[in-house]
Every structure is written in structure tokens, then in C-alpha cells.
Amino acid sequence: MLLLALVGLPTARIFAVSEAGTAATLAFHQVDTTSDIRVERLRAFLASYDSPLTADAETFVAEADKNNLDWKLVAAIAGVESTFGKQIPTGSYNGWGWGVFTGTQDGVHFKDWAEGIAIVSEGLRKNYIDRGAKDIYDMGWIYAANGDSWASHVRYFVDKLESFQPTEVAQLPVSI
């Protein structure tokens, strides 16, 4: 009977890597986000920074899954580039410093946070990972002029998010 009960469960793709030397490895997860603890953890984490990105936690996770990215990566980059969306060019919704290389001071403007998350996620997949970047440090040399420093800061926020535990009752997920 247990087998019959398990047949209807959603499947998940999880790629594991050996533990040694994986501090900056890009891990991929694909899970249904409707009841996903990652969404709740990210939402609480962003709220702890009073981030305008808080309401888009589900978008971060869904776009990460869609593009086979570590679900923490795009949020961590926003932490480095804009203090999680709090310091951006007015009206740009560009919390990632995306497109600053174009010569404009404020880079690309997105219509909203969701569009920014989607475009940055897809861009990281196509322009970094699909072109051989295997970890945040590989990405850093393409993404930022100060590659290793940038990557270390992104890694810091990935690690903080990974270990984050909501402590306020309002931040704890409740299931009935």
C-alpha cells in the first residue's frame, strides 16, 4: 500500500556532488514550489533584510528550477549588488547590476522584480553556466571586474541563506 501512496507524489531532480571542494559548486534542484520550504526560507531571509524582493521569493525559486540554478544564487547576487534590491537606480528593478557594461550608469531597466529575476536567471544559465562556468568563482570573472572578491561576497550570502533559520514566530512556516 505504501507503494500506491508514493505513486502520486511529485518527483524531484537533485544532483549531488562529493563534499570535498564543493563550497562554491553550483547545485541544481527541481521541486514543486507550491509547498516548497525553500520559498518560505527565502521569503523569511529577505524579510530579515527588509528587502523589496521579499514578495518574489517564489519567483526566485521557480526561475532557479526552470534554469537549473542553485535556488540561492540570484538572491545572493542581489545581496551583493544592491543590498537585496534596496539600493538600485530609481525605477529600474535592477538589483543585480545587470547590463551596467553598456556604459549607462544604471544598466538594464526591468518592468518589475519578477521580470528581473527571470531575465537574470536565464542569463546566468545561458551566458555563464552553459559556457563553462562551474562555480561562483568562474562566474565572478565574467560578471564583475573584481572576480574573486565578488564571488566571495556572493558565496557569503549563499552560505547565510543555506544556514538561515527563521526565529520569529511570524517567519516560521505553519502546516495544518
Tell where the protein language model's regions lie, with residue ranges:
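Peptidoglycan-targeting cell-wall enzymes and recognition modules
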Residues: 30-46, 79-133
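Alpha-helix N-cap and coil->helix boundary residues
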Residues: 55-56, 72-73, 93, 131-134
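Non-catalytic cell-wall polysaccharide-engagement segments
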Residues: 1-19, 103-176
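A short structural micro-motif
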Residues: 66, 83-84, 145-146
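Short, charge-rich amphipathic segments
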Residues: 10-15, 43-62, 84-94
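Charged, low-complexity, helix/coiled-coil-prone segments
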Residues: 17-25, 55-69, 96-104, 139-143, ...
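Extended, non-globular alpha-helical segments
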Residues: 2-39, 45
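Export/targeting segments at the very N-terminus of extracytoplasmic proteins
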Residues: 27-74, 161
